[in-house]
C-alpha cells in the first residue's frame, strides 16, 4: 500500500484551467465511488476548492496508481489526458503526507495561514467517510492532520490578521478608489466568501450595500447580520448600473455576468465599475475585462495583494515545517506497526510467482504464440490478479486495527498459504531498505 497525491493548484495551473477541473459539490459522492472502482485504488479522498483540486489516495502500486488517477481525472472532466498532465503534480508517500499537513494548516494556500481550507479538508474527509472510500490509512491520516491544523491555529500566530481573498478584494477596491466613503457595493452571492467580504468592509465607509442571491432567503439572512439591503436576482443589471464595486462569488457552473449585457450596461453607465470575481468556475465572462471602465479582477489577480505576509509569520512557517516533518515520521512509524505491509507484499509476490510459473508453462505448451500475444496474456493475467487481491487487501487493512488483529492476520496468512518465511523475508528487505 502506498499513499499517492495527485492534483493541481494555484501554483501549477492558471484559473482558466482550474475552473474546468472542479468537482461540483452535488457530484462529490459519485466521483469518490467512481474513483474507488478504478484498478489500483484502495482508498481515496477528493479535495476541491477555488484554488486546488487534489486527490489523496491509497494505491497498491505507485506507477499504476498514477495512471489510473490521471485516467479518472481525464474521463470525469471529459478532457484529453495529455491536456491535463502538464498542470498536475504528484506526491508519493512521505511527500504526500507532508503536503497534506501543509495544505490543511494553510501553509500552501494563496492566503498564508488562512483557516478556510481546514474546514474544506474536514468536509472532504467527512464526505469520503460517508461514502466509504476511506479505510485504515486515510482515516488515521486525516484525523491526525485535522487535529494538527487546529493546534496550529490555536497555539501560533500564523492566522493572526491573516489576509483572506475577500480581504484582498477589499484592498483592491481601496487602491482603485482611494477611499470607500459613500461608495455603493453589490455582492452577488450569499455564501462564506460574501460574508468574509462584509466583515472586511466593516468600518470602511461604504454607504450602501446590496446583496443579490438566487435564493433570496439566504441573502436576507446575510443582510440582517450586516444591515445591508437585498436586491432581486432577476433585476441584477439594474443594481449593477448603480454600483461602484461588485463582488461576485456564487457556485454557478457557468458565468452569470455576460460580456454582451455588460457592454450595453457600461455604455449607459456614467461611472466606472470595479468587479471582483472570486468564484470558481468564474462567474464573470473574461471578455468583460475588455470593456472600457469595467475593471475586472479574478482570484489569480489578487495573488499580488495577498503575497505580502509578515516576517513573523514566515518565521512561524519555518518552525511549523520542522514540526510537520516529525508528524510525518510518526505517521509512518504507526503504519509500520500495523504489521500488514509485509503480509500484503508476501501475498502479492506469491501471486506474481504463480503468474510467472503459469506464463512459463503457457509458453512451453503454446510455442506458436507471438511475442505480442504473450505480452497481452501476461497483462490480462496481472490485471486479474490485481482485481482478485484488491478486496482481500482492503479487508486485511481493516483487520489490522481490530482488537484481535494478530489472530485475524494469522488466519489471513493461513487462508492464502503464506508461511512465516514468506513474510519474514519481506520484513528483512524492508528493514534493509530503511537502514
Curated annotation (Swiss-Prot):
Any GO BP annotation: protoporphyrinogen IX biosynthetic process
SUPFAM superfamilies assigned to the protein according to its UniProt record, in alphabetical order: Glutamyl tRNA-reductase catalytic, N-terminal domain, Glutamyl tRNA-reductase dimerization domain, NAD(P)-binding Rossmann-fold domains
Metabolic or biological pathway, per its Swiss-Prot or TrEMBL entry: Porphyrin-containing compound metabolism; protoporphyrin-IX biosynthesis; 5-aminolevulinate from L-glutamyl-tRNA(Glu): step 1/2
Signal peptide stretch: none
InterPro entries (alphabetical): 4pyrrol_synth_GluRdtase, 4pyrrol_synth_GluRdtase_dimer, 4pyrrol_synth_GluRdtase_N, GluRdtase_CS, GluRdtase_dimer_dom_sf, GluRdtase_N_sf, NAD(P)-bd_dom_sf, Shikm_DH/Glu-tRNA_Rdtase
Keyword annotations from UniProtKB, A to Z: NADP, Oxidoreductase, Porphyrin biosynthesis
Keyword Oxidoreductase: yes
Binding-site positions, NADP(+): 189-194
EC number in record: 1.2.1.70
Catalytic activities: (S)-4-amino-5-oxopentanoate + tRNA(Glu) + NADP(+) = L-glutamyl-tRNA(Glu) + NADPH + H(+)
Residues annotated as binding substrate: 49-52, 109, 114-116, 120
Keyword Nucleus: no
Family per record: Belongs to the glutamyl-tRNA reductase family.
Function: Catalyzes the NADPH-dependent reduction of glutamyl-tRNA(Glu) to glutamate 1-semialdehyde (GSA).
Misc note: During catalysis, the active site Cys acts as a nucleophile attacking the alpha-carbonyl group of tRNA-bound glutamate with the formation of a thioester intermediate between enzyme and glutamate, and the concomitant release of tRNA(Glu). The thioester intermediate is finally reduced by direct hydride transfer from NADPH, to form the product GSA.
Subunit relationships: Homodimer.
The protein's name: Glutamyl-tRNA reductase
